[in-house]
Amino acid sequence: MEAAMLQPQSVAQAFLNNREFKSDARKAYLFQQMPATPIYSRPGSSCSQPPTLYSNGAHKTTMLDADVYDSHFPSTPPLSTSGSAIGSPKMFDALQTPINPMFSGLDGFPGKDLFDSVETSVLDWSSCASPPMTPVYIASHPLALQQSTSDLVSMTSCPSLSPSPSPAYARSIASEQDVDFCDPRNLTVSTGNPTLAPEFTLSNMGDADVKGANARPTFDFNPAISHDLPSFQNLDDLDSEDDFSNLVNIEATATGETTRPRACTGSSVVSLGHCSFDDELAFDDNDTFSFLPFPSADATTDVDDGHRDKKLKTSPKNDAVVASEPTDDEVEATSAASVSSESTVSSPSDDNSPTVSAPSRRGRKQSLTEDPSKTFVCDLCNRRFRRQEHLKRHYRSLHTQEKPFECNECGKKFSRSDNLAQHARTHSGGAIVMDLIEDHASHFDGSAMPVNAGDEFSYGKVMFQIGSEVSEITEDASDNKKKRKRTD
């Protein structure tokens, strides 16, 4: 019975017979039924593997030899003193310091209770296994009153140590000999007889200061030189200043103005070209130039030319019309001054007397050098010029005293045309006729000249005919070039 009942139940669990009434009755759909409880695989089965975890952290440190410091001494050398410690006397023997027992192990050292009071553990230096701390003097300790002065080390016996050590620690060194700690006070070596400086006394301090203040270092500026080495001797050539006395002779005059020529106009100054005037301005070696004097007590301001003519203010337009030159009087003064300078100025003498400078002159300084570029030579004075008009001007102004240029307003005559133009600016007139007066007859301008009526009529007729012919020619040319307009 039980077997017969289990078989249909197992089939019912596995399959479900589902018939749809709308579809064909002969077709039956069978599908698997999900179990009520989930099924898990066994933990130890082959299908379940633990997940693999990757760690990026640092690896665990592995100690290969843990007892390194138990069986070996430390790499740091033990505490010891040298023969030249600072503050200690210089000795040739040294006292070796015993090794600190905390590194070598305290064999047979009895264990210490963990619950000692703080005061006793601090004051009892022999109870700890570490190196002793810096000795301090504790005034509240009751044994400090009974401590004798023999336990304290004075400054004379050990000057490099503290004057107030701990009395408990000093007593523990004398009593406890089983713990071999390093006592800094026992590092002092035996006293010998070193070579030390004399003892410093306060009584001689004032005298030492006075001696140090009065002492001055002395230097020997004449050292002994061996015979095989060359020595520098004094240069006797530079002892005298006579060679440099006549290098620059500055004339102490107050009229030392570096000015442009008086005849320069505005246009010539702007263009920086005085080509018509500066061709003969090549200064020779004997000419002296005057500059502003240096502020010295010996400087005298002597003015050779006592008067100075007033320069008239002229408009720039008149300056640009005609380039003017110095007047005839100035040229004559220039020539006279140049002749006098030739006679007075001589070659520099051997003595140290200052050279006599030529008197200041107002005109241009003429060149007396034999310049090959100056091809025009004066027959009378052998002066050379670069241009022929310069030679003619020289002839008329100096030798012949010819004055062919005359002013129309006042009748004054001039040897040069630029002098006449400069003089004409003083008048208020208009046009100036600058012609050579060969027949010594003065000419007048057009306003004063009589004009014939026939000539005026003929001139007007000719001008009218020329104007009409020009107009006809222009009209014919315009008709030929005219295009035909498009007619719509």
From Swiss-Prot:
Query: InterPro entries recorded for this chain?
Result: VerF-like (IPR051059), Znf_C2H2_sf (IPR036236), Znf_C2H2_type (IPR013087)
Q: Among its keywords, does the record have Ribosomal protein?
A: no
One GO term of the cellular component aspect? chromatin
Per UniProt, subcellular location reads as:
Nucleus; Cytoplasm
Report the principal subcellular site: nucleus
Positions the record marks as coiled coil are none
Effect of gene knockout: Shows remarkable defects in conidial yield and virulence. Decreases tolerances to hyperosmolarity, oxidation, carbendazim, cell wall perturbing and high temperature at 34 degrees Celsius. Significantly reduces the resistance of conidia to oxidation, hyperosmolarity, wet-heat stress at 45 degrees Celsius and UV-B irradiation. Leads th repression of conidiation- and virulence-associated genes and affects also expression of stress-responsive effector genes and cellular signaling factors.
Record function comment? Transcription factor that acts as a key downstream transcription factor in the HOG1-MAPK pathway. Plays crucial roles in the regulation of conidiation, virulence and multi-stress responses. Acts as a negative regulator of proteases, lipases, as well as of the red-pigmented oosporein production, and contributes to virulence and growth in response to external pH. Contributes to the ability to infect Rhipicephalus microplus (Acari, Ixodidae) via the cuticle-penetration requiring route involving proteolytic activity at the host cuticle.
Query: Which protein is depicted?
Result: C2H2-type transcription factor MSN2
Q: Which gene encodes it?
A: MSN2
